[in-house]
């Protein structure tokens, strides 16, 4: 057996002696933080949703055995340490002492076992753990996982969307496969749920008995030593960009996400505000319906790619602000050094009108209409789709842009209802496993795509290979992505967000605002 004590796992992270000695979590205690968000969570039950809005809330309320740090590396959270067998088929976790739930009960291994078993049964993320045979309690501080086959278990256990949230065992028993609601939304996080009024607000209050992880000298990623400085954090759904801008300026909001780039010059001139660029943030891409009679033909897909000038698309999406986009072909962002790859890059950013004509002729295409669905909820998506449609139409591809609201677009895409191209964006994936739903045969977001070479490459990268071999296997996957085009990646879009200068200690993060270790100094 291989022991993974915290000293080994955390040696290069923010541990005692590794962070500045003068670090102080809170400049002041108390106050309230009002955060303007683009949308509201669909549920407070952390294991039931993969949406960004649900994840943004879950990380305040719940914790897992392990999580990701600032550098996309797995770190312990509720786990004190773990042991992995030599064959990779057994993991034994020892839990931290004295962890309290929001209802005052102390966490034990039974809570972990019950929560994980429920996740494996009802969560849309359960597919990450198809090779988990069992999870069982050994003693009050020890949990054992037995695997059917070796796979990147820790990486998948740390993924926060949906998170493998730990609930009290009695709550799990009460709800089973039903949605946990109301006062039973109980976790171990630094904030607890006050109230949720769908489409109005999510209110969270400081959990006074939160057990800070003293192995760290400060927060990192989704974990580390987290401290609730503000008494209350409120997430307010404000879908209108103009309303988020106005509220930030007037002080109704202390924070606003996804600000329109067109408002940035005005906001940057306001000394009461601080505007940040969230980088990385989104990969702009289009998904393809591989059941469509034209999109299903590889020469047609290659023609779509050969007609694209990504620089022009990204300029349109960012209103010409070069600091808000990046032309690059990797599915993982350059900041994610473990997975960044330029495999297949020769197919990217190589527009050629003659090549497009040859490929369309090979596909037998004669100007038949192709429905391209998009939305205006995300201005960068809309601008990108307009520019893409113009490039394709100029190249002789008869795309018909169809506008709808974002929820309707998602529903139509999932129902595979009369469309060929779907404008979308991907937030940062933390592990190759998170790409399976878009690349693997039979998965919901692959939209009919199936390639046996891809199946083999995906199986390899999602096996229990050492990290360096997994990286090589991932490069094979990306090579096939660019050779076969299950999706078409355009480039990176970075997003502006803003805070009032009365918020002290706030640090932007690529998937969600983090208001732990943030002080509200407004009187």
Each model region followed by its residue ranges:
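Aromatic- and charge-enriched surface segment that lines or borders ligand/interaction sites
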Residues: 80-125, 138, 144-146, 247, ...
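Periplasmic-binding protein-like
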Residues: 295-336, 383-384, 481-491
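Periplasmic binding protein-like
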Residues: 35, 104, 384, 390-441, ...
């Amino acid at each position: 057996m291989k022991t993974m004590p915290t000293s080994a796992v955390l040696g290069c992270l923010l541990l005692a002696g590794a962070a500045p000695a003068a670090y102080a979590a809170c400049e002041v205690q108390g106050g309230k933080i009002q955060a303007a968000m683009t949308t509201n969570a669909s549920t407070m039950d952390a294991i039931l949703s993969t949406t960004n809005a649900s994840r943004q809330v879950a990380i305040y309320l719940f914790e897992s055995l392990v999580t990701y740090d600032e550098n996309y590396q797995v770190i312990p959270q509720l786990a004190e340490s773990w042991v992995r067998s030599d064959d990779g088929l057994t993991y034994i976790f020892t839990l931290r002492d004295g962890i309290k739930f929001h209802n005052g009960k102390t966490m034990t291994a039974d809570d972990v076992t019950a929560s994980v078993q429920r996740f494996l049964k009802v969560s849309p993320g359960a597919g990450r753990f198809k090779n988990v045979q069992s999870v069982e309690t050994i003693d009050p501080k020890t949990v054992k996982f037995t695997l059917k086959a070796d796979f990147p278990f820790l990486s998948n256990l740390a993924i926060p969307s949906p998170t493998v949230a730990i609930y009290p065992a009695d709550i799990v028993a009460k709800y089973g496969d039903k949605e946990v609601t109301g006062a039973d939304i109980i976790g171990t996080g630094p904030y607890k749920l006050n109230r949720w009024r769908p489409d109005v607000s999510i209110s969270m209050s400081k959990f006074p008995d939160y057990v800070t992880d003293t192995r760290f000298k400060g927060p990192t990623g989704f974990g580390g030593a987290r401290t609730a400085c503000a008494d209350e954090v409120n997430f307010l759904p404000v879908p209108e960009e103009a309303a988020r801008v106005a509220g930030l300026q007037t002080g109704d909001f202390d924070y606003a996400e996804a600000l329109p780039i067109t408002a940035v010059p005005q906001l940057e001139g306001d000394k009461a505000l601080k505007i940040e660029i969230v980088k990385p943030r989104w990969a702009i891409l289009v998904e393809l319906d591989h059941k469509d009679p034209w999109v299903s033909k590889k020469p047609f897909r290659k023609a779509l790619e050969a007609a694209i000038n990504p620089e022009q698309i990204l300029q349109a999406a960012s209103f010409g602000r070069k600091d808000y986009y990046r032309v690059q072909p990797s599915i993982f962002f350059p900041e994610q050094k473990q997975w960044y790859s330029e495999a297949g890059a020769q197919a990217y950013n190589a527009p050629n009108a003659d090549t497009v004509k040859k490929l369309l002729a090979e596909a037998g295409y004669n100007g038949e209409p192709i429905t391209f669905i998009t939305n205006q909820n995300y201005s960068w998506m809309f601008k990108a789709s307009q520019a893409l449609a113009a490039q394709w139409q100029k190249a002789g591809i008869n795309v018909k842009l169809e506008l709808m609201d974002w929820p309707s677009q998602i529903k139509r895409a999932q129902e595979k209802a009369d469309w060929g191209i779907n404008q979308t964006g991907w937030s940062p994936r933390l592990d190759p496993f998170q790409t399976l739903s878009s690349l693997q045969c039979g998965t919901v977001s692959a939209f009919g795509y199936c390639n046996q070479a891809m199946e083999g490459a995906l199986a390899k990268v999602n096996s229990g290979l050492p990290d360096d071999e997994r990286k090589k296997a991932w490069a094979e996957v990306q090579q096939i992505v660019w050779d076969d085009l299950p999706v078409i990646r355009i480039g990176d879009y970075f997003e502006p967000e803003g805070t009032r200068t009365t918020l002290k200690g706030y640090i932007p993060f690529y998937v969600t605002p983090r208001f732990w270790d943030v002080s509200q100094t407004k009187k």
